[in-house]
Amino acid sequence: MSVSGKKEFDVKQILRLRWRWFSHPFQGSTNTGSCLQQEGYEHRGTPVQGRLKSHSRDRNGLKKSNSPVHHNILAPVPGPAPAHQRAVQNLQQHNLIVHFQANEDTPKSVPEKNLFKEACEKRAQDLEMMADDNIEDSTARLDTQHSEDMNATRSEEQFHVINHAEQTLRKMENYLKEKQLCDVLLIAGHLRIPAHRLVLSAVSDYFAAMFTNDVLEAKQEEVRMEGVDPNALNSLVQYAYTGVLQLKEDTIESLLAAACLLQLTQVIDVCSNFLIKQLHPSNCLGIRSFGDAQGCTELLNVAHKYTMEHFIEVIKNQEFLLLPANEISKLLCSDDINVPDEETIFHALMQWVGHDVQNRQGELGMLLSYIRLPLLPPQLLADLETSSMFTGDLECQKLLMEAMKYHLLPERRSMMQSPRTKPRKSTVGALYAVGGMDAMKGTTTIEKYDLRTNSWLHIGTMNGRRLQFGVAVIDNKLYVVGGRDGLKTLNTVECFNPVGKIWTVMPPMSTHRHGLGVATLEGPMYAVGGHDGWSYLNTVERWDPEGRQWNYVASMSTPRSTVGVVALNNKLYAIGGRDGSSCLKSMEYFDPHTNKWSLCAPMSKRRGGVGVATYNGFLYVVGGHDAPASNHCSRLSDCVERYDPKGDSWSTVAPLSVPRDAVAVCPLGDKLYVVGGYDGHTYLNTVESYDAQRNEWKEEVPVNIGRAGACVVVVKLP
């Protein structure tokens, strides 16, 4: 803090006068007055040389400085003398004042020199020791800096105790133990818990709102806590002082409930994590309900996810049978239940109703609406129609009739779509993307997409590189057929078991083929068209699973490579492709019962490298290219056409978001999924799904490796 110039002058003048009168050792004389006169005139108006020095002490001891005199209020007084010299001065001053007071006119003789000198030296030593102690103590804690500026001097200090907060809380804890300075008494049940409002408010938003607002409790010395476990409250009060909690299975729920009331976020998190670690099929429903009641979103979500994942084990426990109807409905309406089929969920509902038929019979109609009855086997629906539990309930009869129509009128299913016709995610299987061309000239990896986790995972690798091959699924196993490795066209076949992740070599085809189409129809697998390295093929081979051999069937009317092949309504369709001169827009189908191929209505555009799939009785053709064989500058297509076999007609639906050649298409659940492809510059890893009801495409989670010409199939594992 600086002072005005006037004050600086006054201070200097006072110091100068003091030094002029009292700075030298006392000169012994029998005449005190002459002593005063000598001291008074000897230095008046003359500078005092070498007497005003600034002293500072560092951590290692006393250090002299030649810096100018400081005038800050917190700084040392300008030009102080050493401690022993100040002692002598003070004694001299005191002695002189005494003489003045005793007799101003006739000075008395002064005490003997030796006695006076000894007293001065002793006093100086004492003061110097005290000064050294004070300086040592100060320099251990303070760092004082002196500026070089004569006009503006500033002293700054910073002091920090690392464990100050911890020491303070320990002191507060001791006050709590001794019941000292407590200013509030919390009453819960049989317990009376003393505490400090400041500590409680610092830890709990609940108490902060209570004690800092104009409410009745803010002025009360005793606060009654309703609806909270006394022991849990006491534990949380102790936690406010110590930060320590004991978590036990038998008290964790009461502790979490109290923490939710007091809005102790950290305690809520640790208690929730403790319960999450205890999740089991026998208790997950109880923890789920508790998390919902307490508003613990994280605990509720984790417990619900665990219940969905382990549903088959959960329904075997008592907690499931004791659930109220509204909780059962929350479970049944979820798409994420991990079950192999809808029939499993139906039997779980009937088990719950059977546990207390008299009281739960009336809830059956409401709960049955959450079961996807159209997806149940028709034999089961026929049995339910005559069951006494269903015949007397009009709502149940209505739902059963809807499901039976879905089975009896398959051609009308597209008009019967509802939430009950949408399969649950776990019942539709998983999507497998196999091989394809990538930036490294061909990938051998297999990726799996799970609807419930919404993610792609690497689950296997082919034994060798294949491009332009085909894949079909028989008995939940993937058959990889033909293709080419570089310029070598293959006729080899391999079988991949997703459960054991084992590859098995199968009998080869009779003809080497790449660019072929592969599909299953009524059991057997067909290899259609392609290129053998020399010419475009119209021949077709059929794999007999029982005989384990390949046989030729009727040939197509037109050679086709990069052809799309799919089965629909007991017929095998071959769509588009290339015949050596140009891309094709024609389509023909094979009837296995007559062993003949027949032409259908053509597409609106010539296309090869298309992706084909069926959904809800329609055939979809996606993407591709339309360049002739001699032109390498293909025009890539984003066009999507839909074929109606009943009317033998084509219609155009919403296009892809980007053009895709050599694209893979496959139905999964209630949507069509388009995977990868080539856009003219990049091997794509993007994925789109098509919603037929809304006629729109939606971007989905991408595959890990961009690929074109991959084969995508669905496998339903038990």
Swiss-Prot record:
GO molecular function: actin binding; ubiquitin-like ligase-substrate adaptor activity
Coiled coil spans: none
Cellular compartments per GO CC: centriolar satellite; ciliary basal body; cilium; Cul3-RING ubiquitin ligase complex; cytoplasm; microtubule cytoskeleton
SUPFAM superfamilies: Kelch motif, POZ domain
Family annotation (InterPro entries): BACK, Beta-prop_ATRN-MKLN-like, BTB/POZ_dom, Kelch-typ_b-propeller, Kelch_1, SKP1/BTB/POZ_sf
Ranges of the Kelch repeats in the UniProt entry: 430-476, 477-523, 525-570, 571-617, 619-670, 671-717
Tissue: Expressed in adult fibroblasts and in a range of fetal tissues including tongue, palate, and mandible.
Keyword Oxidoreductase applies: no
Superkingdom, taxonomy of origin: Eukaryota
Gene Ontology biological-process annotations: proteasome-mediated ubiquitin-dependent protein catabolic process
Start and end residues of each stretch annotated as Disordered: 46-69
Alphabetically ordered keywords of this record: Actin-binding, Cytoplasm, Cytoskeleton, Kelch repeat, Repeat
Subcellular location, record wording: Cytoplasm, Cytoskeleton
Domain BTB, first and last residues per copy: 182-249
Protein's UniProt name: Kelch-like protein 4
Organism: Homo sapiens (Human)
